[in-house]
Amino acid sequence: MPATTGSVRRPKTTGLAKGDPAPGVAKVDPIVVIDDVTRRFGGLTAVDVDHLEIPRHAITALIGPNGAGKTTLFNLLCGFDKPNSGTWSFDGTQLSGIPSFKVARMGQVRTFQLTKALSLLTVLENMKLGATKQKGESLLRSIFPFIWRAQDDEIEEKAKELLVRFKLDAKADDYAASLSGGQRKLLEMARALMSDPTLVMLDEPMAGVNPALTQSLLDHILDLKDLGMTVLFVEHDMHMVRHIADWVVVMAEGRVVAEGPPDTVMNEQAVIDAYLGAHQDVDLGVVTGRVRGELDTAALTLLDDIKADEAEAIAAAEEENQ
């Protein structure tokens, strides 16, 4: 299904995988490769990814229920967090142990679910912060404007061009604090482009956005691919994912349970189970005895599973207390 934005239909990218859609399937041209990455918080395993490849020059959606490990995986890939084990690479370069600012300089940038605009700077000043290798960042050089003035003018011109593209040019001299939630999302995306990235990672770009700006954000995400970038984004809106994503990766309980083209993945039982629960057709009130009713085969199977789990937990507790 082509991606639809307004009256314009954009073709989906196909032929991304070397084999049939399945967790860990090899891609024709991967830009990110993840191997045996785990992240634990105490006794909770937040991420446990055996193998995952993100296709280049495509829009990949990372979906899953709350607590699936999506944002944690994002943080690991960007260097904002450290894994307990595993390795991953970006564009052929190993990123394990590389700090986030160096990852960004390599061309992998991200936005956040909660926007990170500096409220007491203007919109234009926020944009200029996104540019890399600024000569004026050196304390000594900052004293001598003739060293950095020409570059600063170029950066400001680029920032203004992006603000026009994202329809924020009228806000250039306003403080970022005055922007709406949707406008802040646009500012974050525009600022990310100041570093000329290869991979743009968006963490729930539609969260908290006014419906009036949703279409604008969708258009800009599709524009990123048209400009030759790779997009990886976290999202809960299944309808939106189906329409703009070329490839979908589904996580549940820290693991990748499915991946493939949107229309294929949305019909997989693993995806339905992840979002609705493996026993979505079973009345749990009947199973637990709180509601009168007849136990069918599915309910009896679930009841047996519950009893087995209880017995296992009791046995483990008794063994620990011995």
Regions found by a protein language model. Give the residues of each.
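Glycine-rich phosphate-binding loops of nucleotide-dependent enzymes
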Residues: 2-310, 314-321
